[in-house]
Structure formats: structure tokens, C-alpha cells
């Protein structure tokens, strides 16, 4: 059962002093001012458990601020203002800190200095998630005293963790065409055909009638997700950010990175993913032993396949489509891929069948649009095949 403590950042220094916890391990203490900005990291208690970005940045206050703000809902979330108004929070960071920045990605949380809370009492892995639908859709069903991991979910689209019979799942909506949820499902099916390590996605209809994507949790009470941005800060000074990233992974003894990363870049090339930033891929780590297990499964592929184009331009050159994170265009980024990936001969036929089956469920996807998507995707698949053939 959750212990509810009212959030108050107006009680002087003591109320603004927090312990950054890693499960039940105190990591450091820090003072936050009335804007919830870290002004001083006062003590490093367990340096081995510091967030990884604090190990690659010299300024510990800036690094910790980055870490805390990453766990808050971004300003680009379309319903953020509605959430802040409903929960009487001044900004996203305050909203996140009310639930101690508990989340379902990593095992860090912020504990008020005089609190007797512990991980076993409040973590979201061992206790039911009870929350308002407002995170996902319009709703008047709100309990502002709930401790929720949903106030610490990074991402621009409306989304929330829910407790299902199948376990904990992330539900995520789309934008004006609502194409992203369908893209998530299609791309995860592609990954299965390609034998890429990935998170499986399904479509789900919520109470409002809206169709969203649904995927299982890929962390656990023992395994946490560390996004790639934690080690990306030094990469900005390097011409070859791809190799610099691999070097950083070697430095931190993260295994089996290149093959998985190459598969991710090939998939992004194929699907024209413009959203593979350093938060959308990363690593799995045992939070007790601090051992890295490898790359996290491929996830978050909604911003693909012309998701943001009301009308697809068949004459737009493929080399103009943007990419992340190592190069600004896919045609340049794909050149980093040297792993001999194999594409099944049957994939073209299978992909066409999957597109017919999946996108037919979206009333915004007209027959003409689907035909254009299939034609362009088939062309893109031929281009990827041609590139990979040269590697053999």
C-alpha cells in the first residue's frame, strides 16, 4: 500500500533537500531552490550508484538537473497544461517530484531528506498502479493524492502505464492522423520477421473509443533502463559520433552493442524514423550489481512511415528525410552499418500483408494513402537490400 505524503517545497532548506535514491541505496544529497533547480550536490554517498550521466559530466549540479528534468513530462506533451491544472502543479518537475520521480524505466527516485519512505513501500513494480485516464484522454476522474509513475514518463505523445491482466503495459496515443500506434504495431511485426530484439506492440481500444498502442514493460524490479543520452554528452565534440558512442559503451563495459545498434539504424533507414534520439534507445542494467546486460530491445517506432504528412508526396527524394542520432539524414547514417544483416526474401510480401491488415483498422488511412505507403515502403526495402548486399 502506498504512503501518501503531501508535496511542499515552501518549507525552507530542509523541505528542498532531497536524497537521490537507487532503490534503497542513498546515492547523494542535493539542495533544490524554490524553482526546483539543483543548486548544490552536498554529498556523494554511494558514487558507484550515481546516474551514468553524472559520471561523464564534470559539473554535478548541471548533470543532476538534466537527470531530474528528463524524468518529468516534456513541455511538448499536448495535455501537459491540463494535467498541471488538474493536479495543481506549477510545472512538470513539481508534478514529477510529488510522486518522488518514481518511474518504470530506472530505479532512481527522490526522497525528501526527513522522509522515512523506502523503495519496498512505494515502488510501482510491487504495488498496483491506480491512476486517472487524464494522462491518455480527457477525463474528470482525478485523484490528486495518488502516487503515480505516470508523472515521470518522458515523451511528447499522451501515454500512461496501466495495470492489465497481462501485467504492466504502456498505452500511447497518436497525433492528428493517429497513425503512430499503428506504426508501432507494424514496425514491431517487422522486427519479429527480421529477428531483431524488440518490444512487441498491439492495438488497444480504450474507454473513450480511441485506438492506442499497447506494449509490455521491459524493465523489472531487478533490471532497469539507462537511456543512451547518459553517455552522449562527450559525443558532441566528435566528428564520428557513432564510433565515439561505441567507445563510450566499451568504456562502461556494455556488451553486444554494435550488432544491435546496426540493426536499429537499418530499421530506422527502412521506416524513415525521424525520432531515434538518445532517449529512445539505450541499455539494460542490473540495478543491484550495476552490471550492464546489453542494449534494450527496440521500441518507440511511432514516428515513422510518413506519420506527420497529411498527404504523402511520392516525388520527395528519400535522401531528404531526416534521421537521428548520429547523422541528420538516413542516407548518410546507414553507412555506419557494417554488420551483415540478413533480410528474408519473404519480407516484401509479408510486409504488404501486414500493412493491409494493420492500417485498415485506422479510418484516417485512406485506400490511396495506404497504396502510397506500400509502394514507397517496397522501394525503401529494395534500397536497404541493395546496401546490405554490398556488405557481403
Q: Where do the model's predicted regions map?
A:
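Phosphate/dinucleotide-binding and metal-coordinating scaffold of catalytic cores
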Residues: 2-266, 270-272, 284-392
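Catalytic-loop of the protein kinase fold
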Residues: 273, 278
Amino acid at each position: 500500500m502506498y504512503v501518501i505524503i503531501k508535496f511542499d517545497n515552501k518549507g525552507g532548506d530542509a523541505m528542498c533537500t532531497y536524497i537521490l535514491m537507487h532503490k534503497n541505496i542513498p546515492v547523494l544529497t542535493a539542495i533544490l531552490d524554490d524553482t526546483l533547480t539543483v543548486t548544490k550536490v552536498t554529498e556523494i554517498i554511494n558514487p558507484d550508484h550515481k546516474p551514468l550521466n553524472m559520471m561523464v559530466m564534470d559539473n554535478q549540479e548541471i548533470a543532476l538537473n538534466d537527470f531530474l528534468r528528463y524524468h518529468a513530462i516534456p513541455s511538448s506533451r499536448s495535455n501537459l497544461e491540463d494535467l498541471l491544472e488538474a493536479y495543481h502543479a506549477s510545472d512538470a518537475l513539481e508534478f514529477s517530484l510529488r510522486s518522488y520521480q518514481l518511474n518504470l524505466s530506472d530505479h532512481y527516485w527522490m526522497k525528501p531528506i526527513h522522509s522515512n519512505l523506502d523503495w519496498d513501500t512505494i515502488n510501482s513494480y510491487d504495488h498496483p498502479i491506480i491512476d486517472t485516464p487524464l494522462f491518455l484522454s480527457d477525463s474528470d476522474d482525478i485523484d490528486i493524492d495518488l502516487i503515480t509513475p505516470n508523472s515521470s514518463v518522458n515523451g511528447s505523445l499522451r501515454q500512461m502505464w496501466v495495470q492489465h491482466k497481462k501485467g504492466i503495459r504502456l498505452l500511447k496515443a497518436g497525433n492528428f492522423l493517429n497513425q503512430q500506434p499503428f506504426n508501432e504495431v507494424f514496425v514491431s511485426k517487422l522486427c519479429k520477421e527480421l529477428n531483431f530484439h524488440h518490444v512487441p506492440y498491439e492495438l488497444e481500444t480504450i474507454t473513450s473509443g480511441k485506438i492506442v498502442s499497447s506494449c509490455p514493460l521491459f524493465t523489472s524490479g531487478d533490471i532497469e533502463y539507462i537511456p543512451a543520452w547518459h553517455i552522449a554528452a562527450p559525443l558532441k565534440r566528435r566528428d564520428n559520433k557513432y564510433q565515439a558512442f561505441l567507445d563510450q559503451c566499451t568504456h562502461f563495459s556494455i556488451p553486444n552493442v554494435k550488432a544491435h545498434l546496426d540493426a536499429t539504424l537499418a530499421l530506422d533507414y527502412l521506416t524513415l524514423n525521424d525520432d531515434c534520439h538518445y532517449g529512445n534507445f539505450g541499455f539494460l542494467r542490473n540495478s543491484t550489481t550495476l552490471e550492464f546486460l546489453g542494449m534494450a530491445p527496440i521500441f518507440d517506432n511511432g514516428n515513422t512511415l510518413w506519420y506527420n504528412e497529411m498527404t504523402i508526396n511520392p516525388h520527395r527524394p528519400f535522401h531528404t528525410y531526416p534521421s537521428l542520432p548520429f547523422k541528420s539524414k538516413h542516407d548518410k547514417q546507414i553507412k555506419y552499418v557494417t554488420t551483415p544483416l540478413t533480410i528474408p526474401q519473404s519480407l516484401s510480401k509479408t510486409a504488404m500483408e501486414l500493412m493491409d491488415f494493420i492500417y485498415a483498422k485506422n479510418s484516417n488511412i485512406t485506400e490511396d494513402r495506404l497504396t502510397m505507403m506500400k509502394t514507397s515502403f517496397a522501394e525503401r526495402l529494395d534500397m536497404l537490400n541493395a546496401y546490405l548486399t554490398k556488405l557481403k
